[in-house]
Amino acid sequence: MVQKTSMSRGPYPPSQEIPMEVFDPSPQGKYSKRKGRFKRSDGSTSSDTTSNSFVRQGSAESYTSRPSDSDVSLEEDREALRKEAERQALAQLEKAKTKPVAFAVRTNVGYNPSPGDEVPVEGVAITFEPKDFLHIKEKYNNDWWIGRLVKEGCEVGFIPSPVKLDSLRLLQEQKLRQSRLSSSKSGDNSSSSLGDVVTGTRRPTPPASGNEMTNLAFELEPLDLEEDEAELGEQSGSAKTSVSSVTTPPPHGTRIPFFKKTEHVPPYDVVPSMRPIILVGPSLKGYEVTDMMQKALFDFLKHLFDGRISITRVTADISLAKRSVLNNPSKHIIIERSNTRSSLAEVQSEIERIFELARTLQLVALDADTINHPAQLSKTSLAPIIVYIKITSPKVLQRLIKSRGKSQSKHLNVQIAASEKLAQCPPEMFDIILDENQLEDACEHLAEYLEAYWKATHPPSSTPPNPLLNRTMATAALAASPAPVSNLQVQVLTSLRRNLSFWGGLETSQRGGGAVPQQQEHAM
């Protein structure tokens, strides 16, 4: 009876009538229940869990490889919207080519577009460096403008607005801070190696005497992020490609930044659409030698760019038109109480007049009575083209001043001192330095620069030209003198030759006596 019952329990073979698991003290465990749950009728259990995992893995793959119809349609709608927005942006970009310049800016930062900048049309963003000039045609949206780099051969494109540049800068600073912290954690924990990671290559590693906390606190404060981003981009290759789209100019010289007062510099400064031309040198304005040479150059410019240039005299002290003064009402009282020749209202009026003249996209030359040094205008919004008339030899300048008579000779020391101050300026402070001995060379140098600037500000694609410029040129053509132009050219070149060629022929005039150069100069 017992044997029959055991035989009826299942199809076990004679050698395995009773499984050994029955005598296992842990048949009620969790694993045993799972295993029994997938046991087949033939008793095979080796592939139970494998087959189950295979089925579940296959179902997951089939789920991910088959997106729903709603997801597909949503992706198609997004792509269609993107293409339509890009088409409209291209159409607006094409229309902007013939639009007049709304305003101009000078850049304080550099920009190199990257794929993550969300440019309205990929590949049409404009790359620029610090101190470049941009002509803005119109505002596309809150993040992008339409304009062009003032350089020959550059076409219109998308320019990031100040809001966009600030957001890119903040994102860049955040990534740089994270990169610094991660690099400091991955490095050695010793004080010397920590100093190397925090300070980088620009500052030496501080000694292990307690300065580590100072450098660490300095690292956490974003004092030098804008100045160090170029070097940090080179040190971390992966960070350079992703966050190096906005750059600031490197600092001039070595500075200790611990006590530096942080001041946010705007990415752009609004400047005249055409940079005004200002002559300085060879000495002080108001004295005969300087006024004589500058007047000869103004006459030359008036003839060469007839119909394309406006020459105007400025008597107000435009060096007072600093951005920090005009934007700060508390400083107005200080300026008004000082013994200045011009009031701030008069200065502001002159600045507005210069901006208005530049809107016509004509060349603008300023005969400024009070400007004798480029530093006087460095903090203004004029961004002028500084032309330096340079007399290399102080002896030549002395001879010129003495030849003008006693009224000029008694101010010899003042004029020589002003000339020396100009000579001490680095060449970067001037746009053009006219130090040629021959008249033709000096005039050709000046003409080449201004012609190149004219082409940079008037690209061939900007047709029709500015209507204000058309009216001005038409008026100038109607009012032109019927006298032959060649006579005027001969007069201007002759007057310049009498002055500029005198510098090179000073030794000959000294051997022949001092009356010859004086007679030539009075012929001016």
Curated annotation (Swiss-Prot):
Biased composition (Low complexity): 43-53, 179-193
Compositionally biased tracts (Polar residues): 54-71, 235-247
Topology relative to the membrane: Peripheral membrane protein
Keyword flag Ion transport: yes
Entry-linked PROSITE patterns: SH3 (PS50002)
Gene3D superfamilies assigned: P-loop containing nucleotide triphosphate hydrolases, SH3 Domains
N-terminal signal peptide: none
InterPro entries linked to this entry: CAB1-4_N_A-dom (IPR046937), GK/Ca_channel_bsu (IPR008145), P-loop_NTPase (IPR027417), SH3-like_dom_sf (IPR036028), SH3_domain (IPR001452), VDCC_L_b1su (IPR005443), VDCC_L_bsu (IPR000584)
GO MF, any single term: voltage-gated calcium channel activity
PTM annotation, UniProt: The N-terminus is blocked.
Predominant location category: membrane
Region (Disordered): 1-77, 179-214, 228-259
GO biological process: calcium ion transmembrane transport; positive regulation of muscle contraction
SMART domains found in the cross-reference section: GuKc
Pfam families the record matches: Guanylate_kin, VGCC_beta4Aa_N
Record carries keyword Cell membrane: yes
Gene Ontology, cellular component aspect: L-type voltage-gated calcium channel complex; T-tubule
Keywords, sorted A to Z: Calcium, Calcium channel, Calcium transport, Cell membrane, Ion channel, Ion transport, Membrane, Phosphoprotein, SH3 domain, Transport, Voltage-gated channel
Protein location: Cell membrane, Sarcolemma; Cell membrane
Family assignment from sequence similarity: Belongs to the calcium channel beta subunit family.
Role played: Regulatory subunit of L-type calcium channels. Regulates the activity of L-type calcium channels that contain CACNA1A as pore-forming subunit. Regulates the activity of L-type calcium channels that contain CACNA1C as pore-forming subunit and increases the presence of the channel complex at the cell membrane. Required for functional expression L-type calcium channels that contain CACNA1D as pore-forming subunit. Regulates the activity of L-type calcium channels that contain CACNA1B as pore-forming subunit.
Assembly behavior: Regulatory subunit of L-type calcium channels that consist of a pore-forming alpha subunit and auxiliary beta, gamma and delta subunits. Interacts with CACNA1A, CACNA1B, CACNA1C and CACNA1S. Component of a calcium channel complex consisting of a pore-forming alpha subunit (CACNA1S) and the ancillary subunits CACNB1 or CACNB2, CACNG1 and CACNA2D1. Identified in a complex with CACNA1C. Identified in a complex with the L-type calcium channel subunits CACNA1C, CACNA2D1, CACNB1 and one of the gamma subunits (CACNG4, CACNG6, CACNG7, or CACNG8).
Protein name (database record): Voltage-dependent L-type calcium channel subunit beta-1
Gene for this chain: CACNB1
